[in-house]
C-alpha cells in the first residue's frame, strides 16, 4: 500500500530557502552598489584634494606677488670698485657715491668696474646686471695709463674717465685717440668704443680705384707727381744713399674740374698696386670744409687726430697719403678773416704737424685747390709743401686724350671712335667768342668758349651725347653714338654756361680761365 505525502510537509523549508537566496542576492547587489559608490567618492575626494592643492599653490603665488608688489622699487647703480675691506662695494647711485654691502649669494667675479648692479631694500647689492648701453658720446683725446682716459665732449669740455670692464679686457685692443666712446659723466666711466671713429667720418683709409690710365691730357703733371711721391716710397735705399729727404707735401693747383683730385687718387692707387705683396698704402681723404667747427680749438684738435692716425699707420714703413681737398677753406692766409680769425690757430697747427718735433716719415701731404692765392704763404714754402704742380686746362691734344677715356669700342658707336673724337674736338676748339675782358692798361682781350674747357666739362658733354643716343635707340631712329649728337651736346653745354658766370667781379674771369696777368677792370659776355 502506497503512502502519499502531503504538500504541506515541504512548503516551509522551500520558502525559507527561496527567501534566503533572494536576500543574499539583494545584499550582494547592495554591496556592489556600495563599492561602486565608495570608489566614486574616493575618486571625487582625490580630485577635490588635487584641486585644493592647486588652489593653495595659486594662492601662495598670489600672496608672493602681493608681497613683491608691496616691496619698494629696486635701485640701480654703477659698480666702481671693491672696498678695501674686501666685503663691501663702492657704487655710484642716485647721484652720489656709496659704500654698500654685497649679498653673499652674489659671485664676486661678476662685479666688474662699470657694471650695473641692482640694490635691495637695505641698499645691498643683490645682482650684477649688464653694462650701460646708452648715454653720451665723447671723443678720446689720449690714454692715461691703462685704465683711464682723457675725453672731450661736443662742447669741448674735457674730463678724465675710467675704462669699464669691456675696455679693460686684456685680449681687446685699447681705444686710440680719435675714437668715440660711450660715457657716463656722472659715474665717470667709459663703457664702449663706438666702431665709427672721428677719423672715419672725415677720411677714407683705403686706396681709391682710380688709375693713371683714367686720366687724360695730364701726362707731364703725372710724371712730376710720380717723381715727387712714388719714388721715395719705391726706392728708399736710393734716397738714403744720396742723403736725400723725400718731400713732405705736394700742392696741386689750377682751374676747377681739371683733374687735381683724380691725380691724388691715382697716386694712392698706384702706390697700393706697386707695393702689392710687400705691404699696404693708405689714402686719408680729408674734405676741408668738414674740419670746420664752431667751437674754438676743435678744428685744430681734429688736425692733430688726423696726423696721429697717419703716424700710427705709417709706423711700420707703410706709405700714407693725407689728401686735403679744397685746402683754401681751412688754411687761409692769417689775418684775412672777416668775421673771425680762426686761421690764426689752424694754420700754425698744420705747420707744427708738417715740421714739428714729431717725425713724419712715410707720410706725405697732398693738397688741392683752385684758389692758391688764399692759402697762407707759410704753408707753401719749401720744407712744407715742397712741390707745386699746376694743373692747367687741357689743350686740343689733351682734350682728344680725355675723349678717348669716354668714347671707345666698349659702347655702341655709329661711327669709328677716332672719327667721332676728331669731329668733337674740332668743334669744341672752334674759336667762338664768349667774354670780352678790359685790362687795367686799356687793352681788350676776348676769351673763347674753348678757353673754359676742363676734363669735367668733357665728361659732361659725353654724358649728354650718350643720353641722346639712348633716346634715339629707344625711339628707333638710330643705334649708337653719332658725331651730330656730340656736336649738339657741345653746343648745349656752351649755351647753358652763358648765364652762369658772375661778371660782377671781373678779376674772377682771369682766375676761371687759369690765366695770370694784368688786372681785369671790366668783363662783358659776348652774345
Curated annotation (Swiss-Prot):
GO terms of biological process kind: modification-dependent protein catabolic process; proteasomal protein catabolic process
Keyword ATP-binding: yes
SMART domains: AAA
Polar residues composition-biased segments: 497-507
Record bears the keyword Endoplasmic reticulum: no
Compositional bias of kind Basic and acidic residues: 19-33
Coiled-coil stretches: 21-53
Protein residues bound to ATP: 257-262
Region (Disordered) residue spans: 1-38, 492-515
One Pfam assignment: AAA
Keywords of this entry: ATP-binding, Coiled coil, Nucleotide-binding
A GO-annotated cellular component: proteasome complex
Low complexity bias spans: 1-18
GO molecular-function term, one example from the UniProt record: ATP hydrolysis activity
Entry superkingdom: Bacteria
Subunit (UniProt): Homohexamer. Assembles into a hexameric ring structure.
Stored HAMAP family: ARC_ATPase
Similarity remark: Belongs to the AAA ATPase family.
NCBIfam families (UniProt xref): pup_AAA
Protein name: AAA ATPase forming ring-shaped complexes
Gene: arc
Amino acid at each position: 500500500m502506497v503512502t502519499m505525502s502531503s504538500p504541506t510537509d515541504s512548503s516551509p523549508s522551500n520558502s525559507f530557502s527561496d527567501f534566503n537566496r533572494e536576500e543574499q542576492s539583494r545584499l550582494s547587489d547592495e554591496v556592489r552598489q556600495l563599492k561602486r559608490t565608495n570608489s566614486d567618492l574616493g575618486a571625487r575626494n582625490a580630485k577635490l584634494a588635487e584641486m585644493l592643492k592647486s588652489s593653495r599653490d595659486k594662492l601662495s603665488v598670489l600672496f608672493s606677488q602681493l608681497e613683491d608688489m608691496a616691496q619698494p622699487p629696486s635701485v640701480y647703480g654703477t659698480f666702481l670698485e671693491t672696498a678695501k675691506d674686501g666685503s663691501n662695494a663702492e657704487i655710484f647711485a642716485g647721484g652720489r657715491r656709496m659704500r654698500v654691502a654685497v649679498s653673499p649669494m652674489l659671485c664676486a667675479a661678476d662685479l666688474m668696474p662699470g657694471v650695473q648692479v641692482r640694490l635691495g631694500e637695505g641698499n645691498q647689492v643683490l645682482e650684477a646686471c649688464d653694462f650701460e648701453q646708452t648715454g653720451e658720446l665723447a671723443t678720446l683725446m689720449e690714454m692715461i695709463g691703462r685704465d683711464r682716459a682723457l675725453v672731450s665732449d661736443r662742447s669741448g669740455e674735457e674730463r678724465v674717465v675710467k675704462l669699464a670692464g669691456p675696455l679693460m679686457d686684456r685680449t681687446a685692443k685699447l681705444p686710440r685717440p680719435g675714437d668715440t666712446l660711450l660715457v657716463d659723466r656722472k659715474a665717470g666711466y667709459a663703457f664702449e668704443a663706438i666702431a665709427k671713429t672721428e677719423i672715419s667720418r672725415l677720411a677714407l683709409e683705403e686706396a681709391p680705384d682710380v688709375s693713371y690710365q683714367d686720366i687724360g691730357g695730364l701726362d707731364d703733371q703725372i710724371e712730376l707727381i710720380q717723381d715727387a711721391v712714388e719714388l721715395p716710397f719705391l726706392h728708399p735705399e736710393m734716397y738714403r744713399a744720396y742723403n736725400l729727404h723725400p718731400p713732405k707735401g705736394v700742392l696741386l693747383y689750377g682751374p676747377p674740374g681739371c683733374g687735381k683730385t683724380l691725380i691724388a687718387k691715382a697716386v694712392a692707387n698706384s702706390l697700393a698696386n706697386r707695393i702689392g705683396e710687400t705691404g699696404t698704402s693708405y689714402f686719408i681723404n680729408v674734405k676741408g670744409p668738414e674740419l670746420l667747427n664752431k667751437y674754438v680749438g676743435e678744428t685744430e684738435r681734429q688736425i692733430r687726430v688726423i696726423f696721429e692716425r697717419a703716424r700710427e699707420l705709417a709706423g711700420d714703413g707703410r706709405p700714407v697719403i693725407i689728401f686735403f681737398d679744397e685746402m683754401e677753406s681751412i688754411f687761409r692766409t692769417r689775418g684775412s678773416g672777416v668775421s673771425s680769425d680762426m686761421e690764426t690757430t689752424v694754420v700754425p697747427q698744420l705747420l707744427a704737424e708738417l715740421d714739428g718735433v714729431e717725425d713724419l716719415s712715410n707720410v706725405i701731404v697732398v693738397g688741392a685747390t683752385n684758389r692758391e692765392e688764399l692759402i697762407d704763404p707759410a704753408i707753401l714754402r719749401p720744407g712744407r709743401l715742397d712741390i707745386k704742380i699746376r694743373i692747367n686746362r687741357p689743350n686740343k691734344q689733351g682734350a682728344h686724350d680725355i675723349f678717348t677715356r669716354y668714347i671707345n669700342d666698349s659702347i655702341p658707336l655709329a661711327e669709328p671712335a677716332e672719327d667721332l673724337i676728331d669731329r668733337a674736338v674740332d668743334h669744341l676748339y672752334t674759336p667762338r667768342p664768349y667774354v670780352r675782358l678790359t685790362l687795367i692798361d686799356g687793352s681788350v682781350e676776348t676769351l673763347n668758349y674753348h678757353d673754359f674747357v676742363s676734363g669735367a666739362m668733357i665728361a659732361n658733354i659725353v654724358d649728354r651725347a650718350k643720353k641722346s643716343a639712348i633716346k634715339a635707340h629707344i625711339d628707333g631712329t638710330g643705334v649708337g653714338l653719332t658725331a651730330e649728337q656730340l656736336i649738339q651736346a657741345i653746343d648745349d653745354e656752351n649755351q647753358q654756361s652763358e648765364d652762369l658766370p658772375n661778371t660782377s667781379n671781373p678779376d674772377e674771369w682771369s682766375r676761371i680761365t687759369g690765366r695770370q696777368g694784368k688786372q681785369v677792370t671790366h668783363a662783358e659776355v659776348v652774345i
